[in-house]
Structures are given as C-alpha cells and as structure tokens.
Amino acid sequence: MSTSKRKRGDDANWNKRTTKKKPSSAGLKKAGSKAERPSLQIQTLQHAGSTMITVPSGGVCDLINTYARGSDEGNRHTSETLTYKIAVDYHFVADSQACKYSNTGTGVMWLVYDTTPGGQAPTPQTIFAYPDTLKAWPATWKVSRELCHRFVVKRRWLFNMETDGRIGSDIPPSNASWKPCKRNIYFHKFTSGLGVRTQWKNVTDGGVGAIQRGALYMVIAPGNGLTFTAHGQTRLYFKSVGNQ
C-alpha cells in the first residue's frame, strides 16, 4: 500500500513541475532583423522604339545605375547607393545590313564597374584597349592593363547570333522551305551579389557626370560584324544608404 501512495505522490510532484514554453513563431519573427529590413528599391530602364539600343561593330557602352535624386522608388534618396541585383531582358535583332550575308557570330555582354568615371562614359575600346584587328571578336577582349585599377568586370555573358542572307520579311517559294536561324534571339540574365557602391555629387540628375565614384556600365558588342539592335529592359535593385 505504501509503495502505491509514493508512486501517486511522485506522479503529483512531477505534474506540478513547470515546463519551459517554446517561443512562438510570432516572437521569433519579431525578434529577427530580416522581417524589419526594408525592401530594395527598383529602377527600370526600357529600350524600345526610338530608345532601342543600336549595337555597332566595336560595341556600345551605356551607364545603367542612373539614379536621379528624388522621392520615388527609382530615385536615390541619399548621397550613396548600393546596387545588389540586375535583371536583363532583351531581344537582339540583326539589322538589315547584317542580314545581307550568311554569317554567325559570338557576341558578349559585360557589366563593368568604373571606380572613377571622370564625368563621361568610356567607349568599349577605352575599357578593353583592343586593336582594330580584333574589333569584330569581342570574346577575345580583356581589360586594359593600364586601367585595370579603374575598370572591373562584374559579369560577362556570351550569346550566338546567325544570319542566312535573308531578312525576316522574305517569303520562300511555294516549292521550298527555309530553315530558321538565330537572327532574332531572346537574351535573359539575372544576377545578384553585385555590391556596387556609388557615391554621388551634390546634384539632382543621375548622369555619369553626377557620379563621384562607382559607375556601372552595360557593354554590348556583336561578334564577327553581325550588328544588331536591342529591344527590352534592364531592372536594377538597389538601396539608398548613407547620409542625405
């Protein structure tokens, strides 16, 4: 009998012990810094119609972190910005001159960081210092040895285009068919982890002349003289940091 009473007493004492409560999921989310982190700002650059990009032999270089001063989402709110991610969506269309010939070419797109832009955007030849004999072969280009402290290639992507001596509006004869070729291609890239810090002068515009340090360029060059136009958009994800 005594043994059974002790068991009941032990059971009662065990049930009276306080158990630690697990923290609720709501408490964890509240304590976490990620939940309070502000979302990234977005700027979209559209190129279509009159604003399409013409890509000649030798390439083209455009500033893309063009954050003008203002209060909108795509504006910089402070004197410093950080660009984290970029999404690139374009259709590359071979121009009428390139379509006259049967050709294939490997083109290149770069994202190039410029530590000290100096008031104007450089040309692709300034960045890569290629000789005229390599103008048609951008896959062989390297950053100039003398300017490697200024220009840093953040990303490099290759793409292939083709022409067959015909333009897209040509109609084959009724007793023949033409194989499709890559005279019109879709080019998509999404990249993160860029960490491009830009320091701005005390001006309101977002041009290269407003940048004190840290410009970001998109450089595109056609391969083997297969020139084209680019139609689409670039989307940049960034933050305004530092002092106002």
Curated annotation (Swiss-Prot):
One of its GO terms (biological process) is viral penetration into host nucleus. One of its GO terms (cellular component) is T=1 icosahedral viral capsid. Residues 1-39 are annotated as: Disordered. Its main location: virion. It is found in: Virion; Host nucleus. Homomultimer. Interacts with the movement protein. Binds to single-stranded and double-stranded viral DNA. Encapsidates the viral genome into characteristic twinned ('geminate') particles. Binds the genomic viral ssDNA and shuttles it into and out of the cell nucleus. Plays a role in protection of the genome from degradation, virus acquisition and transmission by insect vectors, infectivity, and systemic movement. The CP of monopartite geminiviruses is absolutely essential for virus movement. This is Capsid protein.
